[in-house]
Amino acid sequence: MTKSLGYISLGCAKNLVDTEVMLGLLKDDGYTITDNLYEADLIIINTCTFIEKAKEESINTILEAAQYKETGRCKGLIVAGCLSQQYQDELFTEIPEIDALIGTGAWDQVMVAVDAIEHGNRSCIMENITNIYDERMPRIQTTPRYSAYVKIAEGCNNGCTFCIIPKVRGAFRSRSIESIKAEVERLAASGVKEIVLIAQDTTSYGIDLNNGKPLLTELLKELTKVEGIEWIRMLYLYPTFFSDELLDIIVNEPKLCKYVDIPLQHVNNNILKQMNRRDSREDIERLLKKIRNAPTHVTLRTSIIVGFPGETDEQFQELCEFVKDIKFDNMGVFTYSQEEGTIAGAREDQIPEEVKEERYHTLMSIQAAISEENNRDLEGTIDYAMIEELEEGDNDTVLAKGRLKSQAPDVDGNMYIEDCGDKVKPGDIVQVQVEQGFAYDVVATIVE
């Protein structure tokens, strides 16, 4: 009898990779994947606990999935990921519908959990937080066939005072260059054209393998040799180890997207110190100046936290002026989330929620105007774009949706071609001219 598997993966792309590996292991055991949770014999929820809203979403998703034990075919509910790692006792006690909990380093034990369910037992598998997958693990790609995430490291050593990740993901540990390259070669052979390299701290890649010195540029040099891969993109480039050598290869290697995602979180020196960030405002300014002065334009993305404990109006205004001055191409803004088990979470000078929300909307409004200005500056320029979706428009036209080489999947805006006819299909990389720029998206035409 065919066994069906339903899943929901929450949180970041790093979590999604863990989900894809678990799906691969279950498929090897005979499960078929269904998009309809009502029809699933087994349901896996891979959870996130990074901020309070992520916790709430995870819990609500678990409760919704638990209903399929009564209304659907579900005979086993497995909850994996960061929420499981952090709140295992509470989850098992308060949600009895959960059959198994799998920690962040125990994704490769998913079949042990399934076996326990089949024997009528509940299980909680939390050991081996030092684990990391490699190229030998089966993996079911859930992203479009032409684009895939590749996790090059796991865990984090930075110890930011607002963040729970080191406690739930463990110490920083890198995969070998050989393992990553072998996986990328396999992905390329399956039709992947774009790889997105991810880690909690991507620029620190290799420090645990090379006496404290990063190996990211060495990794990139090897990955550019893989035939079939046309775009290589990196996310989560922590500023401390962002070297001149790394900038040089980004600028000069054709396969590398001229795209830099640097999570700065803040720029006020007192706030940065209280966050336990290694870089000062002056360090940040020097780095961004180098990137802005590069011989080729490099798209800049960052993420910012507003409402950190003790953040004054003056410190927030300093942040706003900095954003106006740098003019980031893309920016994610988060309101500070008071997390249990963190140093910042224990502070008494928490900012009221209404103040955090006001600061969030203020900064997002500033960035929207900057993004629109930057996108308008793209009008008339030529770039490469990846086609992702086609849909019927008015008067028998075909609308194409995709991304410029300067736009990352899931987090940035989109590129639209209003009438592409039958010239393109999903996965194609084509040359386009930007015709109109808006706050987050652009409209383009294909260059014949």
Describe each region flagged by the PLM.
Residues 12, 206-224, 228, 274-275, ...:
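Radical SAM enzyme [4Fe-4S]-AdoMet core and its adjacent flexible, acidic
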Residues 76-79, 86, 91, 189-314:
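Conserved SAM/AdoMet-binding glycine-rich loop
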Residues 53, 172-179, 211-215, 276-283, ...:
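Alpha-helix N-cap and loop-to-helix initiation/capping positions
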Residues 346-448:
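Terminal RNA-binding accessory module
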Residues 160, 180, 197, 234, ...:
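Conserved, mostly hydrophobic/aromatic
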Residues 8, 80, 198-200, 235-237, ...:
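Generic beta-strand/beta-sheet core signal
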Residues 1-205, 245, 256, 260, ...:
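Proteins enriched for Cys/Gly/acidic motifs involved in redox and nucleic-acid/cofactor modification
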